[in-house]
């Protein structure tokens, strides 16, 4: 068996490199087609996300697929030079490739460790390969094991339950302390940059359905609002939006507060005493800190939220050794299972060969004795032959099983095939 991976990720390739090595849906389909033409009996799974591009190739023997074959495949399918692909894609083989896949699926190799999206992306990549008829017993086994490993890490550690980004902490931990649910609450988000986009994603996932994006550029506000099913307004209408808001969020890059304390106090007075949660995620701050003293107003600023992120990060780091131990156990288990499956046919053929020789020798012996032994004596002779055969076979078979359990049976496996003439099909 051979398993090889070539790939790059945010760890080792800048975004401009990853962009040139990423695959569109059509390019993925073309890659599977070309791979099938070149390697009819080999297997391939292709994982392409915004943070990583990885190809997992497998074959029944080391000669069936080389790492250079995968590099050539990527270069041809993406119309890139071979040197460019080779210089920016890391090669992993065997155990290293399996361990890497398990780390990826368990979200231990992600930009944000513990984020849940990557496991579904790994599953989708396998499903695409399966639909293209490019999977087989090796990729099936290793991706099944990766899925099992990821679920163990999720259930046996708390590494996935700690939010690390400011928007995720703000929406996932702070908002539930003030509102039982976001559905029906008027959410006014100021800004239309990356922080605003990430915050909107968490808001939508949290059930928010009454959103408004306010920005100096109405065009940018509208573009972001359209993506998330929100209203769009210019900064000219900010005061009116504040009066309506239940949740007010600041993510702009303005150098001064977008509304001063006295203006906010006047607007809050028009709200009829309704509770308002203000999340100031901006640097510099979008809101004067004194608005937190207003009646019914709960203000959380970037430093409050960053402190929670840092606490969560420390808690996640404490869980890392436990998660890594699970990865190591599953990698060991995968290779033990693989080796045991490989040794099973050899052990069976060895037993069959010994039983055949034993039966032939018993038949020859009883023929020479020419009926001079009774049934009881023949049974004793057969038992003696059985004991002799078992004692002779036990050491090599036990050694083979032990080596398989340790993942090192290849050398002994080949030696037994050669010594006992068991053939490659075993």
From Swiss-Prot:
Highest taxon, organism lineage: Bacteria
Binding site for substrate: 49-52, 110, 115-117, 121
GO molecular function, one term: glutamyl-tRNA reductase activity
Disulfide bridge map: none
EC class name: oxidoreductase
Stretches assigned to coiled coil: none
Swiss-Prot/TrEMBL catalytic activity: (S)-4-amino-5-oxopentanoate + tRNA(Glu) + NADP(+) = L-glutamyl-tRNA(Glu) + NADPH + H(+)
Pathway: Porphyrin-containing compound metabolism; protoporphyrin-IX biosynthesis; 5-aminolevulinate from L-glutamyl-tRNA(Glu): step 1/2
Binding locations of NADP(+): 191-196
One Pfam family this sequence matches: GlutR_dimer
Record NCBIfam families: hemA
Note: During catalysis, the active site Cys acts as a nucleophile attacking the alpha-carbonyl group of tRNA-bound glutamate with the formation of a thioester intermediate between enzyme and glutamate, and the concomitant release of tRNA(Glu). The thioester intermediate is finally reduced by direct hydride transfer from NADPH, to form the product GSA.
Free-text comment on this protein's domains from its UniProt entry: Possesses an unusual extended V-shaped dimeric structure with each monomer consisting of three distinct domains arranged along a curved 'spinal' alpha-helix. The N-terminal catalytic domain specifically recognizes the glutamate moiety of the substrate. The second domain is the NADPH-binding domain, and the third C-terminal domain is responsible for dimerization.
Cross-referenced PANTHER family: GLUTAMYL-TRNA REDUCTASE
Family: Belongs to the glutamyl-tRNA reductase family.
Protein name: Glutamyl-tRNA reductase
Chain's gene name: hemA
């Amino acid at each position: 068996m051979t398993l090889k991976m070539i790939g790059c990720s945010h760890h080792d390739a800048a975004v401009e490199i990853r962009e040139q090595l990423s695959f569109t849906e059509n390019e993925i389909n073309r890659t599977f087609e070309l791979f099938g033409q070149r390697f009819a009996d080999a297997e391939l799974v292709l994982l392409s996300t915004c943070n990583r591009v990885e190809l997992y190739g497998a074959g029944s023997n080391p000669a069936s697929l080389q790492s250079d074959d995968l590099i050539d495949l990527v270069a041809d399918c993406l119309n890139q030079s071979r040197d460019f692909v080779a210089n920016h894609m890391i090669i992993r083989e065997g155990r290293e490739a399996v361990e890497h896949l398990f780390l990826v699926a368990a979200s231990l190799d992600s930009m944000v460790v513990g984020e849940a999206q990557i496991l579904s992306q790994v599953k989708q990549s396998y499903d695409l390969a399966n639909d293209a008829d490019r999977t087989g017993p090796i990729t099936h086994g290793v991706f099944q094991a990766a899925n099992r490993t990821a679920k163990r890490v999720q259930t046996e550690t708390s590494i996935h339950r700690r939010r690390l980004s400011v928007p995720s902490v703000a929406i996932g931990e702070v908002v539930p302390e003030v509102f039982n649910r976001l559905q029906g609450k008027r959410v006014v988000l100021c800004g239309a940059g990356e922080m605003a986009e990430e915050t909107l994603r968490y808001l939508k996932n949290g059930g928010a359905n009454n959103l408004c994006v306010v920005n100096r550029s109405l065009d940018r506000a509208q573009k972001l609002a359209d993506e998330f099913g929100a209203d769009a307004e210019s900064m000219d209408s900010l005061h009116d939006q504040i009066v309506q808001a239940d949740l007010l969020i600041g993510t702009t890059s303005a150098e001064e507060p977008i509304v001063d304390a006295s203006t906010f106090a006047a607007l809050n007075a028009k709200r009829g005493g309704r509770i308002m949660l203000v999340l100031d995620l901006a640097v510099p701050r979008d809101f004067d800190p004194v608005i937190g003293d207003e009646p019914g107003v709960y203000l959380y600023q970037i430093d409050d939220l960053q402190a929670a992120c840092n606490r969560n990060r420390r808690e996640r780091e404490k869980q890392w050794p436990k998660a890594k131990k699970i990865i190591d156990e599953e990698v060991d288990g995968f290779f033990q299972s693989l080796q045991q499956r490989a040794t099973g046919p050899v052990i069976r053929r060895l037993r069959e060969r010994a039983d055949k020789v034993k039966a032939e020798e018993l038949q020859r012996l009883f023929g020479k004795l020419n009926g001079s032994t009774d049934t009881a004596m023949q049974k004793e002779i057969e038992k003696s032959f059985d004991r002799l055969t078992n004692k002779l076979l036990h050491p090599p078979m036990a050694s083979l099983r032990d080596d398989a359990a340790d993942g090192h049976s290849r050398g002994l496996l080949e030696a037994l095939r050669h010594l006992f003439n068991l053939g490659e099909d075993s």
